[in-house]
Amino acid sequence: MGFIDEVKLCLKAGDGGDGCASFRREKFVEFGGPNGGNGGKGGNIVFISDANLNTLLHFRYRRHIKADSGKNGAGRDRSGTAGKDVILKVPVGAQIIDEESEEIIVDLDKPGMEFQVAQGGKGGLGNTNFKSSTNKAPRHFTYGQPGEEKHVLLKLKVLSDVGIIGMPNAGKSKFLTRCSNSDTKVGDYPFTTVRPHLGMVKVDDSEVVIADIPGIITDAHLGVGLGHKFLKHIERCQILLHLIDVTHDDVVLAYSCIHNELELYNSDLVEKEEIVVLNKCDLLREAEILEKKNHLANYLNKEVLCLSINGDLQPILRLLSEKLKKSNSKEIDVYDPFKA
């Protein structure tokens, strides 16, 4: 299945139906009075977050979305029927952004959230509404109001507890494949992952959602490489699992490359909890591994873990689970109208 995480939409809510100017016409009733009905309300455009979706692919060929307009009123006090609402389902984690102002309209970060983005126009009034003691036969009616029109950007940010980051070919995909049921593509070449993958990991009595973020390279924040469009997915993660290929000539440089790109993209990302792991440790002698581990640990002033290609993952997974339980990570400042 394809993966699309950004799409522009043109939304047009339904127009309100026009009111009707009509008069009662019956035999032997010379002056029947007004009986024009009101116009129906235009349909709204509503977004709902659906936990069963994980891409915006279904909007690929549906960029212009229009709700039904309300029907016009009619004689005998018949009101027009309201236009049907358009319900658009999006994955959990989708943000709806006003294209012009670039402000976030809503952040649908929980399952089942519902938000009306474009409101249908009000229906016009029939001439019955204008009858009075001084005007018993009004011919006045009003037209329906136009529905809202909005140009929005849908942006999907993957929701996960842990984000696996690192340079291309650091072993991120294989780590996720081994510890979860995620069927990710694995190969010994850079950029194996070209879209974020999610995996569910059972750790003792808890479950951890882990995301494999595509490899990040120097100047990714400027659009270089495949990592650029996926940097935003890291914002949702509570903890970062930073994998570094131990065979890299300079493990400090490998770490700094990723760290700097995160900071340049969003400085809040480097404040997140991070576990650093030297991966593929079965490819070097123990003395070389120890030297690189100590070098990186001294640079970071914190513990660095080691992992072989087929090594036991449970210690790392348990550490992630424990940190998640204690985690009170700093959240990215996103306007949430549900909490406003």
Swiss-Prot record:
Gene that encodes the chain: obg
Domain spans labelled Obg: 1-159
Organism annotation: Wolbachia pipientis wMel
Molecular functions (GO terms): GTP binding; GTPase activity; magnesium ion binding
Binding residues annotated for Mg(2+), in chain numbering: S173, T193
PANTHER family named among the record's database cross-references: DEVELOPMENTALLY REGULATED GTP-BINDING PROTEIN-RELATED, MITOCHONDRIAL RIBOSOME-ASSOCIATED GTPASE 2
Predominant cellular place of this UniProt entry's protein: cytoplasm
Lineage, uppermost ranks: Bacteria, Pseudomonadati, Pseudomonadota, Alphaproteobacteria, Rickettsiales
Catalytic activity, EC: 3.6.5.-
Needed cofactors: Mg(2+)
Protein name per UniProt: GTPase Obg
